[in-house]
Amino acid sequence: MPNKNMTNKLKYILYQFLTGTVGNFLVFLQPKKARRLAENRITLVHKNKKNLSVSERLMRAALVKKLDKIDDYNQIAELNRGFWINNATELFVETEDGFETDFLPNCTFIFDLLKDELGDQRAAFSTLVEIGTGNGDVLNYLSSEFPEVNRFVGIDLSPKQIELNKSKFNDNKKLEFVAADAFDWVTEHGHSNTIFVTSRGVLEYFLEERLQDFFKEIYRLGKSVFIAIEPNGGGHNFETSPHSQLYGNEPSFSHNYPRLFKNAGFTIWHFSQKPWLGGYDKQTFVGAKSF
């Protein structure tokens, strides 16, 4: 009987054959559909497989393999920023089940840890800011988990998504949604006694230097807590490679979050990692505080 490693290897070989041979053949036979699937690089990489037929999944995998390699960090940052301003809504629709299938079962534990970490100081925090709020589901959830917080602000680059969120959560008067660059908003409106949150892929689009400056700006506000739930490349070892690396097919940046928080003056009170959605990459959980 084949062992588990052999079985996984055979599955990998079969997958490579299907995507490399069958997928490419389907792309050749259906060029219009291929162009539609590949209209946007980031959407192609993240497209929800549940909404695709088997043939479309094979075509998608083959198309992802053909993506041009990008090494220019500034170009990557600009391309990703442009996407999140202009095209993000379609991706949020594609991945809208992620709140139920990923966030609730895999990520909420860190907010239970936050409650324990704050203890009697919970009432001192008057504002919670979610950077990269997306469809607003996480912010809405947090408003019920932290009833002592009076104000919940969701910031996103996409004006269209922000308008959708305002309509969707009109009945929750604690929620505010703002279309803005997070760095600019924090510089102008940030204050002490604030909890900052990112969830499952926001800070990965910052250049390392800008992210470091962003953490320093938040630290200067005064008393604050930061919960970062961010992906990292599966092969990124923070000890041997302390600086940011490219990862994935978008691509985006795998940052050494503990290092960047510490450099800004924060104390790390929680750090853990787990496989992200069962894949090679990792989901990193960081709890940092400025006091």
Q: Which role fits each region the language model picked out?
A:
Residues 2-189, 209-213, 217, 225-291:
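Class I (Rossmann-like) S-adenosyl-L-methionine-dependent methyltransferase catalytic domain
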Residues 193:
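Short acidic/histidine-rich motifs immediately flanking catalytic phosphotransfer sites
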Residues 197-198:
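A conserved beta-strand element that flanks and buttresses the S-adenosyl-L-methionine
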Residues 202:
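Hydrophobic adenine-recognition pocket in adenosine-nucleotide-binding enzymes
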Residues 222:
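Mobile active-site "lid"/loop adjacent to the S-adenosyl-L-methionine
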